[in-house]
């Protein structure tokens, strides 16, 4: 008969951000344990609050399945001596299987008789299996941070205070340090009391009786409904931030949402400051009207019931008011100084002690951004906006507001720049230069912001590499991988030409030419920045499950241009299942293998038709001449591939009728020039020799 097993790990309050991943880990470990133990089950349900991680196994088999198997031992000639007596090898083998020599049978394996015995292992009961393994399920969990308590050396996310371990209505014994498993759980810290769980199936209902909503999904739905009800009552608009909702949900066991207010005078502060104060610092949901204007109200969630809710709201209002008062002070005070004053202060702000100051970084970024602006074809207006943004883009780091709210760097730069009369495009670029702030974060929307973001990240990576501070393994203290991945994403979004190695060399030359290296010695660079960026391109492809051989093909192309890598990968990925794809690639790679051995100057590939020896040469020559007229930078990668693929039958005929490596040197060189011309066009796709076609 199917059973239900319950395991609840009771803890001191966990940080909100670890609750969900931890209970999912517990579920995964429980599933693996049960499967490894051959104990069948139907489902594993999770429950979690800040004080508990729980799994409930449904439809659990009452015992393991019995196991019958046939085990092969030594060959007969080893198992018996010349007189037919059992040898030590046979006796030892049978004992090892829990059998005797009487159980041995012989079976032929490829013409040789071997010893075999049949073994039978009776399945253990579910209680026996659980008793033997649940301790490991609990103790072998991993957490981002761990702690010890009392005099124990054992580490866990938080001290374990109780354990409930029930198989239906029977306690399954588990002992962790001084905590023995039982059937008693704990209710809400303030509203509830200890509660005895009658059976594993009663867990959720029993906890509800002591003011604990154990199901995280139901608790979250309750919070969402309560917020919506408050908004509807007051004609408010509340955009529920899902990350905040998840955090709040993992801070409470019995949620009650309530509304609060703050003085309208604080609405003169930028919205971003108000939202940051409420959402990020106080975990409040902010309120707007139908036109998306902030209103002087908020919604919060308490871990408790509605008793004395007015006092709770007033307490939260006081805390928020204190923070907004600080913000108002800094907002007013910061505007008493010019942008140039803040820029001058950056001369005393260290970017890194081995690299220099933030001011010096800005000077390098100004040169890099000017160089990239020309390369990317920005208009004169955009170039001027970019140059001005690069001159001042870090100034807000030394403002009081960013000192109090570091997460608003860039945002306040935008706000203050516009207040001081700067072009809004300059302010937008200052805001956007941090983007993207994560692997899938928002990208800059403006070209000016995109170039500044690339320039800033290129400088950071180049500077750290120049002083030998490169990421290794999982160690990346300066987030250089994230910044490099950001460059890759921005380049793909903008579609800019970005030959990695050429740009690395050109940018370093620009900095040296403008005497803006500030003692950075690029000659001492321990690893090429280009290789580092190329690895991030690989990461982008791998994240999207692009075939590894397609990735190698485009990565190992001669130009190593990020834009061309993306275009080529898109085309090869789109055509890999075409009926003629295999034949086309094989024709190309045969041609490429031959031309790879050619020792001819790539700048003199003039073909002499008078040296042709068959019609196939002429037909291919005519087709290539026509293709060369179309094969310009304006031609899309898709059209290039299709046009080259159309040459396949002509290339096949060419090889069937032509002895490429003719004994006549002039004829041979003419053949190679003709093929090299095609190879140069094929190589735009990358190194097709890396492709695996079946």
Curated annotation (Swiss-Prot):
Catalysed conversion reaction: tRNA(Gly) + glycine + ATP = glycyl-tRNA(Gly) + AMP + diphosphate
SUPFAM superfamilies, A to Z: HD-domain/PDEase-like
GO cellular component labels: cytosol
A GO molecular-function descriptor: ATP binding
Regions that span the bilayer: none
PROSITE patterns: AA_TRNA_LIGASE_II_GLYAB (PS50861)
Alphabetically ordered keywords of this record: Aminoacyl-tRNA synthetase, ATP-binding, Cytoplasm, Ligase, Nucleotide-binding, Protein biosynthesis
Catalytic activity, EC: 6.1.1.14
Subcellular locations according to the entry: Cytoplasm
Organism: Lactiplantibacillus plantarum (strain ATCC BAA-793 / NCIMB 8826 / WCFS1) (Lactobacillus plantarum)
Enzyme class (EC, first level): ligase
PANTHER family, sorted: GLYCINE--TRNA LIGASE, CHLOROPLASTIC_MITOCHONDRIAL 2, GLYCYL-TRNA SYNTHETASE
The protein's name in its UniProt record: Glycine--tRNA ligase beta subunit
Keyword Disulfide bond on entry: no
Family of the protein in this entry: Belongs to the class-II aminoacyl-tRNA synthetase family.
Gene Ontology BP term (one): arginyl-tRNA aminoacylation
Subunit structure: Tetramer of two alpha and two beta subunits.
């Amino acid at each position: 008969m199917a059973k239900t097993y319950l395991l609840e790990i009771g803890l001191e309050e966990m940080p909100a951000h670890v609750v969900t991943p931890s209970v999912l880990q517990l579920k995964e470990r429980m599933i693996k344990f049960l499967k490894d133990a051959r104990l069948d089950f139907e489902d594993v349900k999770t429950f979690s609050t800040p004080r508990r991680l729980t799994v409930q196994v449904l439809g659990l088999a009452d015992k393991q399945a019995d196991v019958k198997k046939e085990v092969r031992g030594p060959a007969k000639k080893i198992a018996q001596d010349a007189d037919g007596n059992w040898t030590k090898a046979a006796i030892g083998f049978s004992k090892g299987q829990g059998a005797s020599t009487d159980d041995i049978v012989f079976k032929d394996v490829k013409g040789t008789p071997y010893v075999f015995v049949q073994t039978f292992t009776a399945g253990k009961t579910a209680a026996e299996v659980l008793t033997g393994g649940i301790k490991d399920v609990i103790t072998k969990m991993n957490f981002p941070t761990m702690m010890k308590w009392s005099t124990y050396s054992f580490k866990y996310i938080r001290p374990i205070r109780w354990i409930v371990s029930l198989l239906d209505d029977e306690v399954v014994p588990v002992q962790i340090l001084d905590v023995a498993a039982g059937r008693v759980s704990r209710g809400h810290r303030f509203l509830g009391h200890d509660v005895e769980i009658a059976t594993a199936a009663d867990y959720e209902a029993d906890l509800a009786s002591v003011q604990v909503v154990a199901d995280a999904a139901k608790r979250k739905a309750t919070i969402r409904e309560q917020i919506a009800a408050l908004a509807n009552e007051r004609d408010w608009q509340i955009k529920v931030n899902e990350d905040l909702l998840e955090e709040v949900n993992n801070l409470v066991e019995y949620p009650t949402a309530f509304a609060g207010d703050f003085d309208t005078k604080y609405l003169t502060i930028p919205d971003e400051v108000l939202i940051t104060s409420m959402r990020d610092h106080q975990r409040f949901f902010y309120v707007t009207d139908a036109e998306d204007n902030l209103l002087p109200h908020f919604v919060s969630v308490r871990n408790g019931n509605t008793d004395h809710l007015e006092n709770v709201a007033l307490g939260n209002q006081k805390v928020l008011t204190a923070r907004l008062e600080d913000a108002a002070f800094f907002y007013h005070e910061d505007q008493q100084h010019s942008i140039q004053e803040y820029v001058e202060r950056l001369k005393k702000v260290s970017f890194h002690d081995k690299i220099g100051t933030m001011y010096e970084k800005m000077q390098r970024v100004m040169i890099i951004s000017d160089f990239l602006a020309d390369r990317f074809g920005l208009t004169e207006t955009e170039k001027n906006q970019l140059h001005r943004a690069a001159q001042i883009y870090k100034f807000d780091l030394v403002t009081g507001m960013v000192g109090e709210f570091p997460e608003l760097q860039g945002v306040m730069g935008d706000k203050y720049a516009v207040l001081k009369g700067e072009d809004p495009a300059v302010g937008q670029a200052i805001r956007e230069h941090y983007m993207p702030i994560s692997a899938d974060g928002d990208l800059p929307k403006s070209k000016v912001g995109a170039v500044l973001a690339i320039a800033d990240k290129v400088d950071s990576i180049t500077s750290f590499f120049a002083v030998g501070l490169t990421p290794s393994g999982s160690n990346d203290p300066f987030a250089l991988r994230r910044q490099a991945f950001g460059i890759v994403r921005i380049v793909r979004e903008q579609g800019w030409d970005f030959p990695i190695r050429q740009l690395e060399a050109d940018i370093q030359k620009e900095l040296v030419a403008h005497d803006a290296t500030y003692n950075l010695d690029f000659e001492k660079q321990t690893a090429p920045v280009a290789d580092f960026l190329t690895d991030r391109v690989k990461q982008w492809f791998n994240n999207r499950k692009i075939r590894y051989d397609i990735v190698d093909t485009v990565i190992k192309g001669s130009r190593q241009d990020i834009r061309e890598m993306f275009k080529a990968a898109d085309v090869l990925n789109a055509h890999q299942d075409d009926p003629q794809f295999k034949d086309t690639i094989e024709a190309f790679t045969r041609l490429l293998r031959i031309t790879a051995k050619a020792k001819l100057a790539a700048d003199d590939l003039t073909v002499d038709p008078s040296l042709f020896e068959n019609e196939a040469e002429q037909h291919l020559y005519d087709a290539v001449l026509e293709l060369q007229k179309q094969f310009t930078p304006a031609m899309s990668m898709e059209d290039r591939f299709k046009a080259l693929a159309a040459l396949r039958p002509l290339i096949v005929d060419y090889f069937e009728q032509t002895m490429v490596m003719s004994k006549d040197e002039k004829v041979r060189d003419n053949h190679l020039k003709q093929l090299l011309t095609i190879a140069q066009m094929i190589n735009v796709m990358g190194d097709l020799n890396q492709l695996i076609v079946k």
